[in-house]
């Protein structure tokens, strides 16, 4: 079972009401959705995800509360449809966890990770046309370097892009990881290919664009007094969330509930290393 990140903090800031309607924009394997559902009586959780396999697992993992659950397959751009198709106009709370689940990272056929060999896919949604293999094999060197630098925050992006272009064609995750490691040897605890893989995943799934769409759509889906909680793992994502929240606060549309982002406790970071870089921000619509 996927362990949800910062569960206590997220649930507290959502201020769950037993009869409320809550949209989990990133249901994943259902960790946060289940925590919300168990606090409801006549309320509803709308569990949304763009990964069909994850959504089916979320359905199975929340079966105990099936009478309180609705499921919707789609990207952030379709969240309005998720709410209306569940029979509601607005919600009392919205949660978005921008991380990648352990299931996605460890399933070799998904191609998200170099922990096992697999195809260079990285698509969260099978309807996406471009795969990671397309990017590494057909993108020009400068564009590839810019992508790795900007999305992966990888300072050695030019050297990595040069090595990738020279090694073409690349067909598997371990092949790519080996090429990157040869170009930029390990200097710390992180595998040298970690940021490159992250950048490719973000590009394939247009994660920056998806986050922008979420931040534009979400305020209009929340009732007055409705709360929005976002958990991000990249500094670039956290900056986008911070700026949007600041804009909503300054325009008096919302009250920011987290003056500074919350971070996992030492205990959580130890027990769930995937949570270490998490930052949680929350607001309440006026």
UniProtKB/Swiss-Prot annotation:
One of its GO terms (cellular component) is cytoplasm. Belongs to the methyltransferase superfamily. RsmH family. The keyword Transcription regulation does not apply. Pfam families: Methyltransf_5. Its EC number is 2.1.1.199. S-adenosyl-L-methionine binds at residues 30-32, 49, 88, 97, 104. Keywords: Cytoplasm, Methyltransferase, rRNA processing, S-adenosyl-L-methionine, Transferase. Specifically methylates the N4 position of cytidine in position 1402 (C1402) of 16S rRNA. It comes from the Bacteria. GO terms for biological process: rRNA base methylation. The keyword Ribosomal protein does not apply. It comes from Solibacter usitatus (strain Ellin6076). It catalyses: cytidine(1402) in 16S rRNA + S-adenosyl-L-methionine = N(4)-methylcytidine(1402) in 16S rRNA + S-adenosyl-L-homocysteine + H(+). It is found in: Cytoplasm. This is Ribosomal RNA small subunit methyltransferase H. Residues 260-286 are annotated as: Disordered. GO terms for molecular function: rRNA (cytosine-N4-)-methyltransferase activity. Its main location: cytoplasm. The gene is rsmH.
């Amino acid at each position: 079972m996927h362990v949800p990140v910062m569960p206590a903090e997220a649930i507290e800031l959502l201020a769950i009401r037993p009869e409320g309607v809550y949209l989990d924009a990133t249901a994943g394997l259902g960790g946060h959705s289940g925590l919300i559902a168990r606090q409801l009586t006549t309320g509803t959780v709308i569990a949304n995800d763009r990964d069909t396999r994850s959504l089916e697992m979320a359905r199975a993992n929340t079966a105990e509360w099936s009478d309180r659950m609705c499921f919707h397959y789609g990207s952030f751009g379709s969240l309005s449809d998720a709410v209306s198709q569940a029979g509601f106009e607005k919600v009392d709370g919205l949660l978005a966890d921008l991380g990648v689940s352990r299931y996605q990272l460890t399933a070799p056929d998904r191609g998200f990770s170099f922990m096992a060999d697999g195809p260079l896919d990285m698509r969260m949604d099978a309807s996406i046309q471009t795969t990671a293999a397309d990017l590494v094999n057909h993108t020009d060197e400068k564009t590839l370097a810019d992508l790795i630098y900007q999305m992966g925050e990888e300072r050695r992006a030019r050297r990595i892009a040069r090595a990738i272009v020279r090694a073409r064609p690349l067909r598997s995750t371990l092949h790519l990881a080996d090429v990157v490691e040869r170009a930029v040897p390990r200097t710390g605890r992180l595998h040298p290919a970690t940021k490159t893989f992250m950048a490719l995943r973000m590009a394939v799934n247009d994660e920056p664009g998806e986050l922008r769409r979420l931040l534009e759509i979400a305020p209009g889906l929340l009732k007055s007094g409705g709360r929005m909680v976002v958990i991000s793992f990249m500094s670039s994502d956290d900056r986008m969330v911070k700026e949007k929240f600041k804009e909503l606060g300054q325009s008096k549309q919302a009250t920011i509930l987290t003056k500074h982002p919350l971070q996992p406790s030492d205990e959580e970071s130890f027990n769930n290393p995937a949570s270490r870089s998490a930052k949680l921000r929350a607001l309440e619509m006026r």
